[in-house]
């Protein structure tokens, strides 16, 4: 279900498969430790960690190195490859979950081909601590199945679940609560403990056999309900995670009974997928991400093909890497340590190579020196992306040229950076001073988002700057669909009381409410031009795709790719927001609206390129060429707003 969820074909709540995995993992590891304790009266930690090294490290090393290699061809050298390199390094030390928690980049959370390794990091962090605790219990003469041990585990689980609930609901007891609830190991531990407690329970007695079939059926229905109805608006993990967690626990507990349902679950196709599940999980997401990049117009077929291809790669990994190493009895003691060193050093060394190649290798120097690419990262873009195009800064503050008593000020999130060239050109042409202040991932809203620590601080800075500059025209641009359709963890807009939206329609109501509060505040006392979000592009990195197909000699594919238009209907959430905003702004005389679709699109389709050059540098941000196409439209909107020709 996780794989189908990632393909986008089915199961909006397929992410609950990870929670099922945590329960199963807690159960399996506890059974192994209980068996060892019963046979030897102790837990040999060195043997345990040696087995984990042989089981986990070789396969994840193979997948990480393979992903790094493919990223050279399928990801942009302008920041994305660095993100993958950093993720690979964090994943090598099983710290990917902390890495993602600390990131503010939408791309790092949404489209990173190593994003899925956060769950492996959580599992290994649990494995690092739990056996040690059981070892300490053993030294204290506490049996694993004793009442005291069970009560201690239940207390920890209740605490973990409680904090998870509050964090998932956005409670500010810790920074970036929604992200911490999702990625934080302490708030996932209760899911493992449920599996541990099932392992500590005696097998279901025969007198309960009559319950097996209905309980298993109900559990399967509950799982299907959760994967079908949960989505990005579900406050997760929180209380919602209890459905897949306890359903999985019941399936494990009653699964030993021979019923029609258990025999179906144990059928050969499911057994095969179970055997390759670890490597399949490691490989499916990177291949899906790369399929989206190389075949952007194929939203369903390419990801499905990638998922099927990952089955073959996973089978190869199982037969040639996992099983030979895991079953090698000669790999003991110091040899296991050497294996661990090799598995850690290899992706670290390869990540260094990819980092170097992203600036010097495989023809990418030519790509970086391409005039079109350079134009996409102008002086104004350096304000957003740092001193070099690989170093993204979180905020921008800049004032340049023009008459001091007439100022156009541009504010917003990263979307504002994509329009900085156009608005700066309008200011220059009409003798305005131009000022900017925008923060990556922080939209201009009355209620600052909680998923980033600094959004409230940036909003306060922006407000201070607006009051200080007192602009003649305030230009606002947000990538609105990111905050309305649940595209990012914790990024969904809330109402002024902090209430989370249940779906995108309620989120849209909150978005309009926030606009209403903003427009009635003293922030927008000036004339205001709202630049609405451009339609989405199907191509994540068009220039890189052009280079990719040129490298493999498929020039026809390049030409066809750049001739393709994208349907305006593909931006349905964006279109819904644009309509609602326009309706609201009619009520305010000091507000003008400019929709980039009026330049990019006809009634049905939108251009992604002009004269062979891309208008987008990713799926949603305009290149300088795309931005400058907006100059006339923005000029007319501002002229009408301030009654100037």
Predicted regions, residues:
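Membrane-interface helix/loop caps of multi-pass membrane proteins
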Residues: 1-331, 345-349, 644
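Extracellular/periplasmic envelope-modification machinery, especially enzymes
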Residues: 140, 232, 292-301, 306-307, ...
């Amino acid at each position: 279900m996780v794989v189908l969820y990632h393909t986008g074909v089915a199961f909006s709540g397929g992410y609950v498969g990870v929670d099922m995995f945590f329960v199963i993992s807690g159960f399996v590891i506890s059974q192994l430790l209980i068996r060892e304790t019963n046979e030897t009266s102790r837990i040999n930690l060195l043997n345990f960690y040696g087995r984990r090294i042989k089981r986990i490290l070789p396969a994840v090393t193979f997948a990480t190195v393979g992903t790094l290699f493919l990223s050279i061809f399928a990801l942009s050298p302008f920041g994305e490859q660095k993100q993958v390199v950093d993720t690979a390094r964090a994943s090598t030390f099983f710290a990917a979950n902390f890495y993602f928690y600390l990131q503010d980049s939408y791309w790092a959370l949404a489209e990173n081909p190593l994003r899925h390794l956060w769950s492996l990091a959580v599992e290994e962090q649990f494995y690092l601590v739990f056996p040690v605790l059981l070892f300490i219990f053993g030294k204290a003469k506490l049996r694993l199945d004793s009442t005291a041990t069970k009560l201690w585990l239940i207390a920890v689980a209740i605490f973990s679940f409680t904090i998870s609930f509050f964090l998932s609901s956005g409670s500010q007891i810790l920074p970036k609560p929604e992200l911490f609830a999702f990625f934080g190991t302490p708030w996932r531990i209760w899911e493992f403990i449920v599996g541990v407690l099932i392992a500590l329970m005696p097998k279901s007695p025969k007198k309960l056999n009559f319950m097996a079939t209905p309980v298993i059926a109900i559990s399967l229905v509950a799982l299907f309900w959760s994967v079908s109805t949960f989505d990005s608006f579900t406050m997760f993990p929180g209380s919602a995670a209890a459905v897949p967690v306890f359903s999985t626990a019941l399936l494990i507990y009653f699964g030993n009974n021979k019923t029609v349902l258990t025999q179906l679950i144990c059928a050969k196709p499911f057994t095969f997928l179970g055997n390759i599940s670890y490597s399949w999980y490691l490989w499916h997401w990177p291949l899906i991400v790369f399929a989206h990049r190389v075949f952007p117009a194929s939203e369903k077929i390419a990801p499905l093909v990638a998922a099927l291809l990952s089955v073959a790669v996973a089978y190869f990994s199982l037969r040639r890497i996992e099983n030979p190493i895991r079953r090698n009895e000669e790999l003991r003691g110091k040899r296991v340590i050497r294996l661990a060193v090799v598995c850690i050093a290899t992706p670290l060394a390869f990540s260094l190579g990819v980092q170097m190649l992203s600036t010097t290798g495989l023809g990418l120097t030519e790509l970086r020196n391409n005039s079109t690419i350079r134009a996409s990262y102008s002086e104004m873009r350096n304000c957003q992306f740092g001193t070099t195009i690989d170093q993204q800064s979180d905020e921008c503050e800049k004032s340049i040229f023009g008459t001091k008593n007439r100022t156009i000020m541009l504010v917003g999130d990263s979307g504002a950076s994509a329009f900085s060239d156009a608005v700066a050109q309008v200011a220059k042409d009409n003798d305005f001073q131009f000022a900017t202040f925008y923060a990556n991932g922080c939209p201009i809203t009355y209620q600052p988002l909680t998923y980033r620590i600094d959004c409230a601080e940036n909003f306060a800075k922006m407000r201070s700057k607006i009051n200080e500059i007192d602009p003649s025209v305030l230009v606002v641009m947000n990538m609105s669909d990111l905050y309305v359709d649940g595209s990012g963890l914790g990024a969904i807009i809330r109402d002024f009381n902090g209430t989370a939206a249940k779906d995108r329609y309620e989120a849209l109501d909150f978005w309009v409410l926030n606009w209403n509060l903003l427009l009635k505040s003293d922030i927008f006392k000036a004339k205001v031009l709202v630049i609405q979000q451009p339609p989405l592009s199907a191509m994540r990195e068009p220039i890189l795709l052009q280079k990719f197909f040129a490298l493999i000699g498929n020039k026809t594919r390049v030409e066809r790719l750049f001739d393709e238009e994208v349907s305006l209907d593909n931006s349905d959430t964006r279109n819904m927001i644009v309509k609602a905003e326009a309706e609201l702004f009619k009520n305010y005389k000091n507000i003008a609206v400019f929709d980039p679709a009026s330049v990019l699109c006809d009634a049905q389709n939108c251009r992604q390129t002009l004269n062979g050059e891309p208008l987008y540098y990713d799926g949603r941000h305009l290149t300088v060429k795309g931005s400058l196409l907006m100059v006339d439209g923005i000029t007319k909107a501002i002229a009408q707003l301030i009654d100037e020709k």
